Amino acid sequence: MGARASVLSGGKLDAWEKIRLRPGGKKKYRLKHLVWASRELERFALNPGLLETSDGCKQIIGQLQPAIRTGSEELRSLFNTVATLYCVHERIEVKDTKEALEKMEEEQNKSKNKKAQQAAADAGNNSQVSQNYPIVQNLQGQMVHQAISPRTLNAWVKVIEEKAFSPEVIPMFSALSEGATPQDLNTMLNTVGGHQAAMQMLKETINEEAAEWDRLHPVHAGPIAPGQMREPRGSDIAGTTSTLQEQIAWMTSNPPIPVGEIYKRWIILGLNKIVRMYSPVSILDIRQGPKEPFRDYVDRFYKTLRAEQASQEVKGWMTETLLVQNANPDCKTILKALGPQATLEEMMTACQGVGGPSHKARVLAEAMSQATNSAAAVMMQRGNFKGPRKTIKCFNCGKEGHIAKNCRAPRRKGCWKCGKEGHQLKDCTERQANFLREDLAFPQGKAGELSSEQTRANSPTSRELRVWGRDNPLSETGAERQGTVSFNCPQITLWQRPLVTIKIGGQLKEALLDTGADDTVLEEMNLPGKWKPKMIGGIGGFIKVRQYDQILIEICGHKAIGTVLVGPTPVNIIGRNLLTQIGCTLNFPISPIETVPVKLKPGMDGPKVKQWPLTEEKIKALTEICTEMEKEGKISRVGPENPYNTPIFAIKKKDSTKWRKLVDFRELNKRTQDFWEVQLGIPHPAGLKKKKSVTVLDVGDAYFSVPLDKDFRKYTAFTIPSINNETPGIRYQYNVLPQGWKGSPAIFQSSMTKILEPFRKQNPEIVIYQYMDDLYVGSDLEIGQHRTKIEELREHLLRWGFTTPDKKHQKEPPFLWMGYELHPDKWTVQSIKLPEKESWTVNDIQKLVGKLNWASQIYPGIKVRQLCKLLRGTKALTEVIPLTEEAELELAENREILKEPVHGVYYDPSKDLIAEIQKQGHGQWTYQIYQEPFKNLKTGKYARMRGAHTNDVKQLAEVVQKISTESIVIWGKTPKFRLPIQKETWETWWVEYWQATWIPEWEFVNTPPLVKLWYQLEKEPIIGAETFYVDGAANRETKLGKAGYVTDRGRQKVVPFTDTTNQKTELQAINLALQDSGLEVNIVTDSQYALGIIQAQPDKSESELVSQIIEQLIKKEKVYLAWVPAHKGIGGNEQVDKLVSQGIRKVLFLDGIDKAQEEHEKYHNNWRAMASDFNLPPVVAKEIVASCDKCQLKGEAMHGQVDCSPGIWQLDCTHLEGKVILVAVHVASGYIEAEVIPAETGQETAYFILKLAGRWPVKIVHTDNGSNFTSAAVKAACWWAGIKQEFGIPYNPQSQGVVESMNKELKKIIGQVRDQAEHLKTAVQMAVFIHNFKRKGGIGGYSAGERIIDIIATDIQTKELQKQITKIQNFRVYYRDSRDPIWKGPAKLLWKGEGAVVIQDNSDIKVVPRRKVKIIRDYGKQMAGDDCVASRQDED
């Protein structure tokens, strides 16, 4: 924090600490606000160093100000802090933040006026648009664009990954895209193109805005004058139909057209929509995490509360109830003890350091030490005393310049108050916070090297001399405390001589701590008391000394009394006689890697899976392996107190007689917390820069070198069984990361990165690529120097317990790394041999496809489409599959390609990347990325069909998208593309179909076959061509259908089909029209499905029928396709509909429409009810609702989405027309009882509850804290009727807001029927009737009335069934899974039906067919092996 704290110094810091956060508030700015601000700036990709000057603050304000309106609270706080800091730098006197903002505004207004005057004078001189993406003037006077940097792109990708479209994304996007061109913005969007749903929303917004732009800026008639630029269209602004040069010209013309800013505004509009969709936060969702500090939780709670749409009273209730209710258990206990009237300040004080990670206690210690400091220090804090400021010193490591909160050193063990182990500060019973900085004895500035068994900040495996401080043995408590070890002690490393300052006889001397010396020997000095002569032997011979007994000596602040020898010694020595008294120990720490804390998923326990029987040879092999592992400390034995178990087994190693131990961690993996993978992919050799010297290392026993969290080890327990259960099994648990456990890769990678970090910093000229246990080390050093560095690296790794075996240490090329073969100036994949086989199984083909995919990185032209087709459907791995002719041909072609070895080259950052794409046919594409022709960096293929129907242009865009993403990952930039498509073809397509996956810079390359559009649909009807009205119909039950057409020239045709659907017949009808028409034709359909397929102009399809239509379309000269709504009485459409419906559609529903409309006018029932009651198609029923003006106020309310216990009702009062309506909702069904009550009193409410209980089974009523619900009358009524009353939040958080939404729904229905009733109470009962019986939807598609009856009846049946289930519990089930032939079990029988049973195996509930289970009675603890009861027992 040293750098961050240096933002202000001296008088400026005093001025800063006088400014109040709010006008009239108590809190003032402190140093911590500067630290926070500098951290926040890093998140916005801004340099924290800018805070040190007023100009820097101005620049920050300029970046943040545009985003303030849409920004989050954090952004606003950051802006306020920087504005206040600016005033301090400029020495503008301000009292609080508000005043600082006003002064800032005044300054900005002044500077705006100055700039306006200067702009006129400087026009033409300054062409720089932005700092971020400058469009600069080169030496020739041309405007040149500097492309967006990979660092900015990386920051943007990280923002999306971390924030996941939370509100902070918008200001961050705004800051990162300052001054960008549309092409830059498209590059940014391309990098996050994988978020398809979000990109789709963004695309729609951009489409709308572009259309609006085109509407407001119509094209001028006539040709453009020479030398004049054309005006940008909407698609030009979005960078789809404009070139980079055009964009630069628009942005730098006079007057400029800021296409970048306009496009950015459109994107921000789209991002706003996305944010609203992705971040719907309700106050009920705000809960304190198990390790979240209370202060952070309160911040989130109030931030959300401010946005909540509720009255002040409701917000008050939320603060009183929800804040405590949703705190974590630790904080909740403390808050409840404080009582109901506690202030927020008291709550935060009480919960400080509780509920957060252990390091939060450091903050509390810091605060306590400051609180106990002298009054002068307090005066200085307040700014009353201008004396010299005391330097900040860390409590954790003792260094100056930062506080414990920001300390990077590992946390010291033990309590921060008394120094003892076994508890933390919050649990300390010591009354005095004896934690003043002077108590820490850190001799000679070595305070940074603190004692900790687990971590070493500076010297991982150094021998260390540690002085364990005991309390003064002369004190009263000395006798009690003998042997108590305190961690408040120095640690002295042995890289240098351990010299310390000692105090003896009132004199200070320097002495050497010598654990090899028996006695303490000091140079000539006078000591009080009697002495005896003595001779002592040393390395230089014997010397005469004086022996003084019972001498008091102070070493590192710790006192000891013992014998001291005085004589002519070359150096003062403190020997073991005194070192043992002060608890000094010599330590040899090993494998000091910091353990990563790991937890199970909330609410889950460890695995308890039984060990299955193993053969004798496997047991012997496992016993040998585990004995060896135990000796090495990788595993340790556990006793019967550990209830957890994971099964193990053994397999033979490949081409060896040795055995390998495998642990089946599937169950533990399900229960372990999720981890963030540190690396998202593997490094690629094409991204390596060419290096003079290269070495490849492999870390031996990688996982077994990293310790596992002590508290988690018990869950990894496993058992080696004995033969024939002769003795109990031997049980072990892992002390290190186990193979096969889900946390091992992430923890190993994280540990390895931390270990390599200091080496990387010391040797920036060396490149280390790290993936799991494979290390690639490259440098431009001479080979001798390079190898010296490699040895340093190996030594560095060895200090941390990582070995790099010589066996896998590759010094000479070719290097085998990550499946690649690396040479000094080229690379390839390790040799690939395709197997020759007579017959191919599914497994063989899967392996073959995997090999070919791997080879396609560098071998251009590899295809696998036909081979993949063979694997379609669910097939057993051993099933033999005959190769089709196409697959055999494809395989033969691939063999030819692989015959000649192909190499790739390394990346040169000074040259441009170029990507060239070729079409291979059958939807397959190949591409090469290179910097020099015929020297490929890498190659690849693409054969994915994103939809059933597509065309080449669409697929080409997908290939480009894939290559762009791949290039950004490997090289941090996108290549220039060379595509086999004419510019005209491209523009024809994208004028209609532009979207959020834009093409970067590209040029046409004439590589056959070229991509083209095979046919085009007309925009307007073709005059003089015959018009075909087409339609199709099918019966769902019989699958019979008809397709046909009627033309405007009197022709008609109907063709019957079998085994068809409505959608197929619609397409068949179009196909018929195309077959029977001339070269020009107009076709009118009422099918949106058919229209959607054909308008996208596909040229290939998986559907045979669509392929036929495509063939017909290619033959035509002109085709116009139009859509009309069905059943609207449109001439030709109505005729053809009747023609194809005869004998197909069961009932002509037209008769029911009038009745349905009539009923809707009365009851305003929803479309589901009408579709069900009058046998109408959903589209017709929806049309009736759509045409009703009273039903268009809002969308329909969702019913029945909450599934709760049958006896829960929620009650609430709502107000309408000055009257009170009491509403009761049955939570599970959405059924309503409501009444207008004379007054909102307890008496009326109690009477209503009794009426409700008389009609329905009511077990629980959930209400708010209104006075009528908390009254004695209601309590008495509930007690009499046996109803439990709940307030606040019900236990099921899903059921929140049920009454609120029903109130709105009821008011909406009342509004629809109000004019039919004179009195409100009549309208209320009409609305209740409509809601309960005339609206269908939700669970089961019932009305609420039907649903409540169904739920109550089901509840009664379930209770009856429950009685029978207790009988079923006495049975055990053995069962087989779909493919696995081994019998599993025993499982618990939950339910037995005719065709299947429901069983519970461990915690999983499964449904298994009857034919795959054996049900037996539970005969106690007898083992059910393959040859005992389970196999022989008849089925029950």
Swiss-Prot record:
Annotated residues for binding of Mg(2+) 1: D698, D773, D774
Leftover remarks: HIV-1 lineages are divided in three main groups, M (for Major), O (for Outlier), and N (for New, or Non-M, Non-O). The vast majority of strains found worldwide belong to the group M. Group O seems to be endemic to and largely confined to Cameroon and neighboring countries in West Central Africa, where these viruses represent a small minority of HIV-1 strains. The group N is represented by a limited number of isolates from Cameroonian persons. The group M is further subdivided in 9 clades or subtypes (A to D, F to H, J and K).
Zinc finger (CCHC-type): 392-409, 413-430
Region (Interaction with Gp41): 7-31
Matching InterPro entries: Aspartic_peptidase_AS (IPR001969), DNA/RNA_pol_sf (IPR043502), Gag_p24_C (IPR045345), Integrase-like_N (IPR017856), Integrase_C_dom_sf_retrovir (IPR036862), Integrase_C_retrovir (IPR001037), Integrase_cat-core (IPR001584), Integrase_Zn-bd_dom_N (IPR003308)
Key words, A-Z: Activation of host caspases by virus, AIDS, Aspartyl protease, Capsid protein, DNA integration, DNA recombination, DNA-binding, DNA-directed DNA polymerase, Endonuclease, Eukaryotic host gene expression shutoff by virus, Eukaryotic host translation shutoff by virus, Host cell membrane, Host cytoplasm, Host endosome, Host gene expression shutoff by virus, Host membrane, Host nucleus, Host-virus interaction, Hydrolase, Lipid-binding, Lipoprotein, Magnesium, Membrane, Metal-binding, Modulation of host cell apoptosis by virus, Multifunctional enzyme, Myristate, Nuclease, Nucleotidyltransferase, Phosphoprotein, Protease, Repeat, RNA-binding, RNA-directed DNA polymerase, Transferase, Viral genome integration, Viral nucleoprotein, Viral penetration into host nucleus, Viral release from host cell, Virion, Virion maturation, Virus entry into host cell, Zinc, Zinc-finger
The enzyme's E.C. designation: 3.4.23.16, 2.7.7.49, 2.7.7.7, 3.1.26.13
Catalytic residues of the enzyme: D514
Domain Integrase catalytic: 1202-1352
Region (RT 'primer grip'): 815-823
Binding site for Mg(2+) 2: D1031, E1066, D1086, D1137
Xref: Pfam families: Gag_p17, Gag_p24_C, IN_DBD_C, Integrase_Zn, RNase_H, rve, RVP, RVT_1
Residue(s) at site: Cleavage: 133-134, 364-365, 378-379, 434-435, 442-443, 489-490, 588-589, 1028-1029, 1148-1149
Residue span of region Dimerization/Multimerization of capsid protein p24: 278-364
Zinc-finger ranges (Integrase-type): 1151-1192
Record-given protein name: Gag-Pol polyprotein
Compositionally biased residues, Low complexity: 116-128
An example Gene Ontology molecular-function term: zinc ion binding
Stretches the record annotates as Interaction with human PPIA/CYPA and NUP153: 190-228
Motif Tryptophan repeat motif, residue range(s) on this chain: 986-1002
Cofactor note: Binds 2 magnesium ions for reverse transcriptase polymerase activity. Binds 2 magnesium ions for ribonuclease H (RNase H) activity. Substrate-binding is a precondition for magnesium binding.
Region (Interaction with host CALM1) location: 8-43
Gene coding for it: gag-pol
